[in-house]
C-alpha cells in the first residue's frame, strides 16, 4: 500500500535495512538481534540468530543502554505520553539544544521532512524518550529526569502501574509529577505541576 511504501522509504532514509522475516536478514554482518515483546520465540529471525550464536536482546534493554549514554528525559503515564514527549522535544529544538527523540507516535514536522517521525538523532547528548508501560519494562530505565503524567487502568491495574511509575521516578535523578492526579500523591518528586493549589507550577504562573 501507499502507507507501507511511505513508511519503508522513511525507514530506509533513516538508514534502516528492510528484510523479510524469514531469517535471511541474519548474516555474518549481524552483531545482535533486538526484539520487542510482540515478537514470538518461533520467529524465523530469532531462530536464525540463535543458530548463529548471536545475542538476542529485548528492545527495552537496548533502550536502557541508550538512555545511560545520554542526558535523558523520560515521559511516562497512562495517557498523553506521545504528546508531551513531542512538546519537550520541540521546546528543546526551538531553544537550539539539538535533542534526539524516541517516541511512540510520529511528529508531523519530522514526517513532513520525509523522516520516520518517531525517532530523530540530534547533535547533542540530550534525549527525549516516551517510556511505555504496557509490558512493564520501563523499570529498566534510569533517566536523568522523568515526567509522570497520570495513572488510570489501561494495560495493567492501577496498583501495578503505580509501582512501575514510582520505580521510574526513584531511578531518576529528577522527577516531575502531576499534582492533580491523586494516584500520584504519595510519589516523591523534585517538582509538581497541574492546575490545583498543590502544584508547584500551574498554567497561571506562565
Predicted regions and their residues:
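Thr-Gly-centered strand-to-loop micro-motif
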Residues: 1, 35-36
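NAD(P)-binding Rossmann-fold cofactor-contacting core
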Residues: 1-10, 99
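Phosphate-binding loop of NTP-binding sites
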Residues: 13, 20, 25-30, 37-191, ...
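Short acidic/polar mixed-charge low-complexity motifs
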Residues: 125, 197-199
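Active-site glycine/GP-rich loop and adjacent strand/helix microenvironment
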Residues: 196, 205-206
Amino acid at each position: 500500500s501507499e502507507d507501507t511504501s511511505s513508511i519503508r522509504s522513511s525507514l530506509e532514509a533513516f538508514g534502516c535495512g528492510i528484510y523479510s522475516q524469514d531469517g535471511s536478514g541474519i548474516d555474518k554482518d549481524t552483531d545482535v538481534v533486538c526484539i520487542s515483546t510482540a515478537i514470538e520465540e518461533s520467529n524465523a529471525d530469532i531462530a536464525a540468530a540463535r543458530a548463529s550464536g548471536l545475542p538476542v536482546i529485548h528492545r527495552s534493554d537496548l533502550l536502557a543502554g541508550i538512555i545511560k549514554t545520554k542526558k535523558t528525559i523520560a515521559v511516562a503515564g497512562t495517557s498523553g505520553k506521545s504528546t508531551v514527549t513531542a512538546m519537550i522535544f520541540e521546546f528543546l529544538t526551538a531553544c537550539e539544544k539539538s535533542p534526539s527523540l524516541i517516541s511512540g507516535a510520529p511528529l508531523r514536522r519530522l514526517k513532513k521532512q520525509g523522516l520516520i517521525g518517531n525517532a530523530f538523532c540530534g547533535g547533542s547528548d540530550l534525549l527525549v524518550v516516551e517510556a511505555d508501560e504496557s509490558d512493564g519494562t520501563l523499570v529498566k530505565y534510569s533517566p536523568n529526569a522523568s515526567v509522570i503524567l497520570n495513572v488510570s487502568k489501561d494495560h495493567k491495574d492501577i496498583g501495578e502501574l503505580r509501582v512501575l511509575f514510582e520505580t521510574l521516578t526513584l531511578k531518576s535523578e529528577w522527577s516531575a509529577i502531576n499534582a492533580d492526579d491523586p494516584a500520584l500523591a504519595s510519589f516523591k518528586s523534585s517538582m509538581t505541576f497541574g492546575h490545583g493549589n498543590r502544584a508547584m507550577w500551574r498554567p497561571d504562573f506562565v
